């Protein structure tokens, strides 16, 4: 099972200008290598059979005939191969020459994609030799003894995907042909190019491909000629680039004197999910113009079992490398802006936050502090309330106190033990029975205290619960589940950790930094069960519901793309290959789906809070799900894995 992935390649072969025999040999060699690696579709550079820099030689009959003979040789020598190949060559149609991409498979020409926009400025003179697809009067051409479709509007359909083609300058047009092709069904765009180099041009090219890939919600495979093309006036660096919905998957080395084969896998299921979600894409389909695409059916008859070469980030909510700092700053700024508007609108005089010494309440407090600073309000009007209970440890208690002191906010300490003991007596609950009643009573007592203090001080209770907890329902209904404004509600646990660490290292004095970093290293726990005999945290959340890094991974692919459990399981086994075994992943995947469905009733009445990333479970916005939906089909698929 390929789980919606299509393996593609951008080839950058050696070339000799006007030496079709040499070029065909190099093309055949790379096709064979790609076939051996399980590639399903491969694209070569523009005019790959002749070379792009032939100039006025394109008017020579012998070169045009040699090109067709070269194509015939490729057809004969790849007749037994399942791979679809896209090669570039001049094609004669009614005494005109077309700059063409010829699509071939198993000895047959499937179709000829014609270049629409012929550059005729600066170093380019293509209109001197070629005719645009816009001037074609026929929709078929004779090539290698076959009558085949020709045009700029061809779509090639397989059971795995539908793809279209544009050629070099087409991408640079105001409305590229790929836009129309995508709107009519193309999920992958292949571009064969002869893109010469200039200072700053490569960065612009990558930006252009990224944007077009994102705008079309498509995969984009780009192959441009390299070593061997004439350097009389320009230089070609051999750019091979593969993008998926704006993100770079693979790229070639520039200015490399060796042949290159750039391989990756396009996730067509992901593209389809994005298009389903993005209703603007569907609305745009009415604007495809009068020239409708011509569909050409083919198939990957002998497709091998897919082996992925692309990687998957085990923490999809957390950017890698230099982007992390920028991402953290942006997330923090969104939280601050959301809370600032709500404080101004409600004219709240205080912000009330329950401080446990854990990650979530720490992040919420940091947001409050920076919001008050932004609004020019005194930090003393932030009321940090620590409420020790039966499971509170010295470590979390001391961290809570130290953090509040270092930030200069007002501190209130109210033990919940006496109130809970009285409550247990009132409802006739044995204090030695540490069940759900025992735990939830403490959470609700804390929420009641915070709400009453907010009323007492004309304030607002700022919620601390994060996206991961809310997805799993790991919150007490009408306890920590409830607040007057939740600043962490769309931030997953894996990102909360990095946010707190980022603030510690970039915006805190040494005392506050030390406390924050210790909080980052503290085991995640609601501390509702008494500590162990050594005073350490006994109730560890990840021992009970599973690792948050796994649940965040499941959550991302379930909500963001609507993937089925089997595909999420497949991807998780790749992403966490050296961390968790298959049975562990399966166990917690089942837990995730069971809890996600069972706990929707808590998400149906969430307090307001800002959307920060691409995923939110606000019942008023991104996620509208009935509280009594059945999880049967999801759990059954996991059971069958």
Residue ranges of each PLM-predicted region?
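ATP/NTP-dependent adenylation/nucleotidyl-transfer catalytic domains that generate, transfer
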Residues: 7, 23, 159, 216-218, ...
């Amino acid at each position: 099972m390929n789980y919606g992935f299509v393996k593609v390649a951008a080839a950058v072969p050696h070339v000799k200008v006007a030496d079709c025999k040499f070029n065909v040999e190099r093309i055949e060699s790379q096709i064979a290598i790609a076939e051996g690696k399980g590639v399903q579709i491969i694209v070569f550079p523009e005019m790959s059979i002749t070379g792009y820099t032939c100039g006025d030689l394109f008017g020579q009959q012998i070169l045009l005939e040699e090109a067709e003979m070269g194509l015939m040789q490729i057809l004969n020598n790849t007749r037994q191969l399942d791979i679809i190949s896209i090669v570039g060559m001049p094609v004669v149609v009614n005494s005109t020459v077309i700059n063409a991409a010829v699509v071939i498979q198993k000895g047959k020409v499937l179709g000829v994609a014609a270049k629409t926009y012929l550059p005729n400025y600066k170093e380019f003179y293509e209109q001197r030799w070629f005719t645009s697809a816009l001037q074609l009067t026929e929709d078929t051409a004779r090539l290698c003894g076959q009558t085949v479709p020709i045009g700029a509007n061809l779509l090639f359909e397989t059971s795995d995907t539908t793809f279209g083609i544009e050629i070099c300058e087409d991408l640079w047009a105001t409305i590229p042909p790929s836009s129309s092709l995508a709107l009519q069904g193309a999920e992958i765009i292949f571009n064969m190019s002869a893109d010469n180099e200039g200072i700053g041009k490569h960065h612009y090219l990558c930006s252009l491909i990224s944007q077009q890939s994102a705008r079309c919600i498509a995969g984009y495979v780009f192959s441009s000629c390299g070593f061997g093309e004439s350097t009389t006036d320009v230089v070609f660096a051999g750019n091979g680039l593969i993008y998926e919905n704006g993100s770079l998957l693979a790229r070639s080395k520039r200015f490399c004197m060796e042949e290159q084969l750039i391989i990756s896998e396009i996730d067509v299921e992901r593209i389809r999910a994005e298009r389903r979600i993005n209703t603007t894409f569907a609305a745009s389909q009415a604007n495809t113009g009068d020239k409708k695409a011509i569909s050409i059916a083919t198939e990957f008859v002998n497709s091998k079992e897919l082996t992925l070469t692309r990687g998957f980030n085990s923490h999809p909510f957390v950017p890698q490398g230099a982007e992390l700092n920028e991402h953290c700053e942006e997330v923090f700024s969104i939280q601050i802006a959301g809370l600032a508007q709500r404080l101004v609108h409600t004219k709240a005089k205080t912000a009330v936050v329950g401080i446990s010494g854990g990650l979530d309440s720490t992040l919420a407090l940091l947001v409050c502090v920076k919001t008050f600073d932004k609004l020019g309000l005194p930090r003393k009007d932030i009321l940090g309330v620590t409420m020790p209970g039966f499971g509170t440890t010295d470590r979390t208690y001391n961290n809570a106190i130290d953090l509040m002191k270092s930030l200069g906010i007002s501190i209130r300490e109210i033990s919940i033990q006496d109130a809970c003991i009285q409550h247990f007596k009132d409802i006739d609950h044995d204090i030695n029975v540490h069940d759900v009643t025992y735990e939830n009573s403490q959470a609700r007592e804390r929420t009641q205290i915070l709400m009453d203090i907010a009323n007492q001080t004309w304030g607002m209770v700022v919620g601390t619960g994060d996206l991961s907890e809310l997805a799993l329902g790991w919150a007490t209904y009408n306890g920590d589940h409830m607040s007057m404004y939740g600043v962490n509600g769309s931030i997953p646990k894996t990102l909360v950790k990095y946010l707190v660490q980022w603030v510690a290292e970039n915006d805190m004095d040494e005392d506050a930094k030390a406390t924050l970093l210790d909080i980052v290293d503290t085991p995640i726990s609601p501390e509702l069960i008494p500590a162990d005999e050594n005073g350490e945290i006994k109730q560890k959340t990840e021992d009970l519901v599973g690792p948050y890094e796994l649940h965040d991974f499941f959550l991302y692919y379930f909500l963001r793309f609507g993937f089925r459990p089997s595909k999420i399981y497949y991807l998780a086994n790749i992403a966490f290959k050296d961390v968790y075994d298959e049975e562990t992943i399966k166990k917690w995947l089942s837990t995730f789906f069971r809890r996600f469905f069972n706990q929707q009733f808590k998400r149906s009445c969430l307090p307001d809070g800002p959307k920060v990333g691409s995923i939110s479970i606000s019942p008023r916005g991104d996620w509208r799900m009935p509280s009594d939906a059945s999880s049967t089909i999801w759990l059954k698929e996991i059971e069958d894995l």
